[in-house]
């Protein structure tokens, strides 16, 4: 019974993280949570769709209540402004992409079109989930050649400067940019 309760809590937390990340449309969100119910709670697979809908609604209501206490400008909004500015400097930003292969595919596509970007910044849904609860978003940064950014690179310094300009503290550590930011993405009231 304790394992069942832990599994249910795990799926509920997954639903909460997905809702707060805001990376999926309604249908994809429901499908992800339904699949998690089916996989983690197989004895409740026959009601997986209903449980997914209920737990998503519960997570959305919790988010609506929480966002009332957020400041006027959240870290998420500052991140979006910073990412828009970074993109103006020919650095693509992939938010919530599947993995490094998505960044590689983007760079290959742009290179094939003769428009290799200066770089690409990317992070996965798991990185967003970490920022939802822990207040740190880890961002990968590659040059347009797929080479990792490194200390002393103008690309890295420029991206760090843009983040700082938008009120975000960031540092390069172990191959990634660590941004002190809570992913507080608002949903409609």
Predicted regions and their residues:
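Short, charged low-complexity intrinsically disordered segments located at boundaries
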Residues: 44-46, 114-115, 189
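An N-terminal amphipathic alpha-helical segment
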Residues: 95-138
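Acidic, proline/glycine-rich low-complexity IDRs
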Residues: 138-189
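Glycine-rich, often proline-containing surface loops adjacent to acidic residues and nearby aromatics
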Residues: 58-64, 132-143
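Long, contiguous N-terminal structural blocks used for assembly/anchoring
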Residues: 1-97
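A broad, low-specificity signal for short, low-complexity segments enriched in glycine/proline
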Residues: 54-56, 101, 188
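Short linear motifs at secondary-structure transitions and domain/linker junctions
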Residues: 67-70, 112-118, 154-157
